[in-house]
Structures are given as structure tokens and as C-alpha cells.
Amino acid sequence: MVERERTFVMVKPDGVQRGLVGEIISRFERRGLKIVGMKMLEVSEELAKQHYAEHAAKPFFPGLVSFIRSGPTVAMVIEGKDAVSMVRSMLGKTKPIESAPGTIRGDFALDMGRNVIHASDSPESAKREISLYFKTSEIATYARIDEQWLYE
């Protein structure tokens, strides 16, 4: 049995407004990752401040909070082997100009402040961020029909 890890992913307002949600979900699913939780929401100021708490003292914090609240977002819990590192590699670098073609940011993002997507940077961050956005009852447990072909 393969040990599966969960990570938190959010399509930011720019990704939602540009109609990229379906393409992004498809990339994760085609890679063999499983979406076990998903919701569209408008992030409250309180939730935005909790989510980005580690940046509270930084000069860009107010803009970060303002942007994440500027429109609807799509929050997801994604599960799979090494999900945190797998998803991070699929996203590309935070600065889109440094992101390789074929990554989500390399293909769709132009500006660091509007970089389409957020994902947890560690298993600890994933647990914290998942708990901010999802109740345990909102996360599904199921097996993909192709799991026997994905993992040894």
C-alpha cells in the first residue's frame, strides 16, 4: 500500500476569472493525483489573514490579502504519493518568469502578484491550510479506478 499525502491547492481569483479551473484540475488528475475536497468560495478578510499569517509583517501583506479577496477562488485538497512536492513541481516557481514551460505558472502566469495558483509548501503547511478551509466531513475517501496502475 502506497502512503498517500494530502496538500492544499487554491486557484486564485485571476485563475478563476480567466477560466483556468478546469485545465488546472485536469492536469492534476492526469498526473494521477486525486481531488478529495473542492469548493468555490470568496475568502473573508479574517480567513485571508489566517492563511497568510506568516507574511503579516511584510510590506506586501495588505496587497496579498486584498488580491485573494478580489474574486472567487477554488480551494482543493489533493491526495497522492508525495502530493506536496508533486503539486509544487507542477506549479512552477512563484515568479512566473522563472517557471518552466509546461508548469501551470509557466503556461498561464505573467506576474508574481497574479500567479494563478497557490499550493502548500510543506506537509505541515498543508495540514494547517486544509484545516482552515475544510471540515473533516468535507473531505472524501475513495479509490480511483486506475490506482492499481499508478502505484507499485
Curated annotation (Swiss-Prot):
EC number: 2.7.4.6
GO biological process terms, semicolon-separated: CTP biosynthetic process; GTP biosynthetic process; UTP biosynthetic process
Transmembrane segments: none
Record bears the keyword Phosphoprotein: yes
Localization terms from the record: Cytoplasm
Enzyme kind, highest EC tier: transferase
InterPro entries per UniProt: NDK-like_dom (IPR034907), NDK-like_dom_sf (IPR036850), Nucleoside_diP_kinase (IPR001564), Nucleoside_diP_kinase_AS (IPR023005)
Keywords: ATP-binding, Cytoplasm, Kinase, Magnesium, Metal-binding, Nucleotide metabolism, Nucleotide-binding, Phosphoprotein, Transferase
Cellular component terms (Gene Ontology): cytoplasm
Matching SUPFAM superfamilies: Nucleoside diphosphate kinase, NDK (SSF54919)
Residues at the active site: 118 (pros-phosphohistidine intermediate)
Coiled coil: none
Cofactor: Mg(2+)
GO molecular function: ATP binding; metal ion binding; nucleoside diphosphate kinase activity
Sites where the protein binds ATP: 12, 60, 88, 94, 105, 115
Catalytic activity: a 2'-deoxyribonucleoside 5'-diphosphate + ATP = a 2'-deoxyribonucleoside 5'-triphosphate + ADP; a ribonucleoside 5'-diphosphate + ATP = a ribonucleoside 5'-triphosphate + ADP
Pfam entry (one): NDK
Alphabetical list of NCBIfam families matching this protein: PRK00668.1
Functional note: Major role in the synthesis of nucleoside triphosphates other than ATP. The ATP gamma phosphate is transferred to the NDP beta phosphate via a ping-pong mechanism, using a phosphorylated active-site intermediate.
Family in the record: Belongs to the NDK family.
Name of the protein described by the UniProt record: Nucleoside diphosphate kinase
Organism of origin: Methanocella arvoryzae (strain DSM 22066 / NBRC 105507 / MRE50)
Lineage of the species this protein comes from: Archaea, Methanobacteriati, Methanobacteriota, Stenosarchaea group, Methanomicrobia
